[in-house]
Amino acid sequence: MPTDAADAGEVTATYEATETERRLTFERGDQRATVAQNREGYAMLAVREGPDGEERERYYGFDMALDHAAELLGVGPAALPVPEAAEDMGM
């Protein structure tokens, strides 16, 4: 399972590809938000409360999914580091 990580001060990001989906998980303190997409990369992005958490919303655009993830963490979207392996997520 390939992984990649990035750090931007108080927010860390971990990208992983499982057998069924790609996951970009952000952590800030004890809060987590995950942007997930199917492995093939053509489905909408799901925003969850962590990798296996409750799905909150689905988006076509990566930017919109990042906005929601940032909101869940209480930061602005610019505070979210995106590992290189995850830069092509979205439709």
What are these regions (language model features)?
Residues M1-M91:
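Acidic, polar-rich N-terminal leader regions of halophilic archaeal proteins
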